[in-house]
């Protein structure tokens, strides 16, 4: 992760919104460089750490919150739950998301695990913690990313524009008090450990569109190639 101003790395709207925590982002860059110096790699690749903030702040209408990046090398791309188009097999959480996508919307299974088309529709795929050590889930929790992502969520809420927050799992649900009057869809996490406890059948995609329509906003076209 390069030591450059946020305005050179992310969307202008996000650069302004995250200005109060820019020094924290700088500190996290220093932390990641120290990890490398100690012989520890991190995921995703440096140029993708802030990728969720490269899509326009003003266009976000659905927020999907993840926990931290996939710890498997080659999987994490800087967008929660998404992977690069060539990744096979898919992470099991994403497999479960696609199962619910099929059952909720009636669409065929997407050809890849790349969720970028959702981001281009105004769906923000944000992890609470933006980096992880390979093979060690949750290894960067409590290291300093949480104030950054919480600032981002407060900025989304402060716009007072139609938005639906989709919170999968207990970690994501702790953000609910920060969301104010934002419409929220909550369920267990799509992980194989919890998906059968209420994620399957929760219909997050169609419910998000129903809520957006009730607010007078355009629904999301969830179809993936």
UniProtKB/Swiss-Prot annotation:
Keywords: Cytoplasm, DNA damage, DNA repair, Hydrolase. It holds the Pfam family UDG. GO terms for cellular component: cytoplasm. It is found in: Cytoplasm. Transmembrane segments: none annotated. It catalyses: Hydrolyzes single-stranded DNA or mismatched double-stranded DNA and polynucleotides, releasing free uracil. GO terms for biological process: base-excision repair, AP site formation via deaminated base removal. Its main location: cytoplasm. Excises uracil residues from the DNA which can arise as a result of misincorporation of dUMP residues by DNA polymerase or due to deamination of cytosine. This is Uracil-DNA glycosylase. It comes from Mycolicibacterium vanbaalenii (strain DSM 7251 / JCM 13017 / BCRC 16820 / KCTC 9966 / NRRL B-24157 / PYR-1) (Mycobacterium vanbaalenii).
């Amino acid at each position: 992760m390069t030591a450059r101003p946020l305005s050179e790395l992310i969307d202008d709207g996000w650069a302004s919104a995250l200005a109060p925590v820019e020094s924290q982002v700088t500190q996290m860059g220093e932390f990641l460089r120290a990890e490398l110096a100690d012989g520890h790699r991190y995921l995703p690749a440096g140029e993708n750490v802030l990728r969720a903030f490269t899509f326009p702040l003003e266009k976000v209408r659905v927020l999907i919150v993840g926990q931290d990046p996939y710890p498997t090398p080659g999987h994490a791309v800087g967008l929660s739950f998404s992977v690069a188009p060539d990744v096979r097999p898919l992470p099991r959480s994403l497999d479960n998301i696609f199962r619910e996508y099929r059952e909720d919307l009636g669409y065929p299974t997407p050809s890849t695990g790349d969720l970028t088309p959702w981001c281009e529709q105004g769906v923000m795929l944000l992890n609470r913690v933006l980096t992880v050590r390979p093979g060690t889930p949750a290894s960067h929790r409590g290291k300093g990313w949480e104030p950054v992502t919480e600032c981002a969520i407060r900025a989304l809420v402060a716009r007072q524009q139609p938005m639906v927050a989709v919170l999968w799992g207990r970690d994501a649900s702790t953000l609910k008090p920060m969301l104010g009057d934002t419409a929220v869809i909550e369920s267990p996490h799509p992980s194989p450990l919890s998906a059968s406890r209420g994620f399957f059948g929760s219909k997050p995609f169609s419910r998000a569109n129903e809520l957006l329509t009730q607010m007078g906003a355009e629904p999301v076209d969830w179809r993936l190639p």
